[in-house]
């Protein structure tokens, strides 16, 4: 017998929690370094097949800022707020919701629970929050983003359980600074004086003793790159104690290998990117539970705006006009979740109240005739080889994604065939680590992956701001973390109107007005940028054995491990 749960998220409110960029590179990535080792089942552990295996554990760094890293490390590092599946905030370390204490200057005060402590029994205090803030703002540290933190002019520790943040101006999404999985509070007493860029790459531990350290229900017991990460209960956790003996994450980065490992009992749980026919495969496994919901992850087609050809906005508009997004939805994601549909917004998901179909200016089914007319008017002439050319530049581009992801590979094929009809040649060029190397090194031309949205789009400002264009560095250098950069504007687009609207949204406290501002941002992106074309809102797909109970998917960046302390496990032997 199997059990299936198909759900559509409850409606998001206009102003709520953040999706830090973990979101960003996070859910976007499908495959990390592929392991040659076959996963081995452990009857005393829950074994999870991980599509994206973390290269490092420090989730604040660009190299570690992936959703799988967040789902693995997140249960070890508590945050001010826990982000719930309905996208509401629940105070976690905080004893209550942080409060606005003054409008001029804009000041927010937060109070900690008095019983919060680290796994070594040292109290977790406001000094740890201050240390985390200082670490993020230290220009020597490679952090994924400083957005929001850079609006704080003073961070005042009032007492061990109280701190105060004074902002340059009104900053509406202040909760977001302490709610994302990339904002787990850091232990000052073990990390002070350490090299942040290296200290937690291979362990979440006290660097002096190598003893695991944490403040959440689990601890990271061990990490073997490309092989496994093991997390175990934190015996000194101040909240509800976890009862699972341990959870072992192993890399299973190929779509077919993942379901085969699940069917063979080599792994007990999988949380794959959407794959064609995967729902039926999971449901066919005896004793399996399948769950799917429409989360904040959204698939998109990106064009690097500095590439010759793509530097012409008319070319980008023609491609947006031709893209058969409805066909992609029908063939790639519809069987995973019946509620899947074309996404016409980069700031809000389809079931969020502020959602407006701003990208419907481009027909969902794709219009080849209209796209050809745009290119004709822009002077791009069709050559004898069927490829358009202008001033010696051919409209011939590579299109990459994470190799081994059959759903994305099908999307590529659909796009390739359609764009051929408008004189645009697409050559597919994939790699397992394309996001961690090629994309961040700007060694790509076009690409398909997914960002993670949020109830309040502030968390993804770094995708759109011109000041969030990272330093261009060599792919090999990027992979090992030797680039001094932050931000995620990987299409290198500059749109001053977007910058102005985002700055205005940050200081607007009225949720209705903020929602309107972000829709204005989206309309600018759809008409005057056109580098990131939304395809669809991704359904989550979670499969697990019915020997595990208490599992509840969380479509935020926290993922399915968000309530790991509620899991129970009936060992198989």
Tell me the role of every PLM-derived stretch.
Residues 39, 329, 364, 373, ...:
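Extracytoplasmic/peripheral linker and loop segments enriched in polar/acidic and small residues
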Residues 49-103, 134, 213-214:
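N-terminal lobe/hinge region of extracytoplasmic solute-binding protein
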Residues 74, 85-88, 182-242, 368-369, ...:
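Gly/Pro-rich hinge or "lid" segments in bacterial periplasmic/extracellular proteins
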Residues 113, 206, 233-281, 413-416, ...:
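Ligand-site clamp/hinge motif
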Residues 146-197:
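Surface-exposed binding/hinge segments that line
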Residues 218, 340-384, 403-410:
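Structural transition elements
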Residues 225, 380-454, 511, 537-540:
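Ligand/substrate-recognition segments at binding pockets and active sites
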Residues 542-573:
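Long beta-strand-rich cores associated with HINT superfamily self-processing modules
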